Amino acid sequence: VIAAMRPDLEVILVESRKRRVDWLERAREGLALENCRVAGCRLEDVERIDAGTVSARAFAPLDRLLDLAGRFSTKTTDWVLPKGRSAAQEVQGLPKNRRKMFHVEQSRTDPDAGVVVGRGQWSAKP
């Protein structure tokens, strides 16, 4: 959706499962999304870039997701992480001095779900 709505942005979709990679590739080709690339590998194997936005859904617990994706972040990276019902609890589980980087927004599609939103650089070691 982002690649279709914002052709001025480079969008990289990371997915390690072959069937999903194939589906994403077909969708990308069918929609002629020139600005979209599918990386068919684990996040840990993706070449480091400076990401303007990091978004991930149902990937890993928040602390692990941040540690894995943090190497792509800069001081101006926006984080948009749909986390469902556990959003507030997962933010509270972060180290106190680092949780201030994030807040929880109400999901627009599920009244019981939250989206973790933040801005800034995350490193695995504080």
Segments predicted by a language model, with ranges:
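Short amphipathic alpha-helical segments
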Residues: 25-26, 66-70, 91-94
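A conserved beta-strand element that flanks and buttresses the S-adenosyl-L-methionine
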Residues: 55
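Conserved beta-strand signature within the Rossmann-like core of class I S-adenosyl-L-methionine
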Residues: 75-89
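Active-site capping/gating segments
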Residues: 86-126
